[in-house]
């Protein structure tokens, strides 16, 4: 169970008007019903590492957490120290590995990780749906790392217990504004902005929310 949470932790994730740190977001998660976070990178590329940072922070706070990599990139595998050739979603989909064998542990933290191992999987595929359902039963929180250029696949990942996090590693808010604008064009307005530790700047704000 979660533990050692400050009494003044925010009651819910601060949506929209402020960029939060991973620690602030974790404190908020303890008091919310959110069980899944969809992570998008504000840097314009795929496979931002915000999900790795957040997963480690969640695990340190005493919650069980798993990161599902749907980017089809190798950055998350490299950052978490998972050996090349380790099985992932591709092997699971091809019946080459059972679910238990595609779940790996972050070598630098306590978060578990499932890799894409191949082309980026479709979020609404039966295999991804099965993995997400199993993880929802087994973990306090599931993080889904998604390529920001595949926002059209977001609806299949969203429900009343899912939040969208735009994680930034850039030194300016331009990336936040770009991703947020694209999401709003799809009718998605309820966003959380998280600044990754490597480039955190005090007082930086997220783009204004529409009235």
List the model feature ranges, each with a label.
Residues 47-51, 55, 176-180:
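Short, highly selective alpha-helical patches that border small-molecule cofactor pockets
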Residues 1-35, 87, 94, 170-173, ...:
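Acidic-aromatic/histidine active-site loop/patch
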Residues 53-55, 120-123, 164:
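Short, charged low-complexity intrinsically disordered segments located at boundaries
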Residues 56-68:
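Post-Walker A helix-loop "phosphate-sensing" segment adjacent to the P-loop in P-loop NTPases
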Residues 124-211:
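Conserved catalytic-core segment of NTP-binding enzymes
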Residues 6-16, 27-49, 66-140, 148:
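P-loop/Walker-type NTP enzyme "switch/lid" segment
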Residues 62-64, 110, 187-191:
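A generic structural signal for alpha->beta connector loops
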């Amino acid at each position: 169970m979660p533990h050692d949470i400050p009494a003044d932790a925010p009651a819910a994730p601060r949506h929209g008007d402020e960029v939060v740190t991973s620690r602030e977001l974790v404190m908020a998660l303890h008091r919310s019903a959110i069980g899944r976070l969809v992570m998008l990178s504000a840097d314009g590329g795929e496979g931002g590492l915000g999900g790795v940072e957040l997963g480690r922070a969640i695990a340190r706070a005493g919650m069980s957490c798993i990161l599902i990599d749907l980017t089809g990139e190798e950055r998350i595998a490299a950052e978490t120290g998972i050996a090349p050739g380790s099985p992932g979603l591709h092997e699971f989909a091809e019946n080459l590995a059972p679910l238990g064998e595609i779940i790996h542990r972050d070598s630098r933290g306590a978060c578990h990780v499932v890799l894409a191992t191949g082309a980026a999987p479709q979020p609404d595929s039966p295999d991804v749906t099965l993995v997400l359902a199993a993880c929802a039963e087994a973990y306090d929180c599931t993080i889904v790392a998604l390529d920001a250029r595949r926002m059209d696949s977001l609806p299949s990942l969203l429900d009343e217990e899912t939040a969208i996090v735009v994680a930034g590693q850039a030194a300016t808010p331009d990336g936040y504004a770009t991703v947020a604008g694209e999401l709003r064009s799809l009718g998605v307005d309820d966003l959380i902005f998280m600044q990754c530790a490597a480039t955190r700047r005090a007082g930086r704000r997220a783009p204004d929310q529409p009235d």
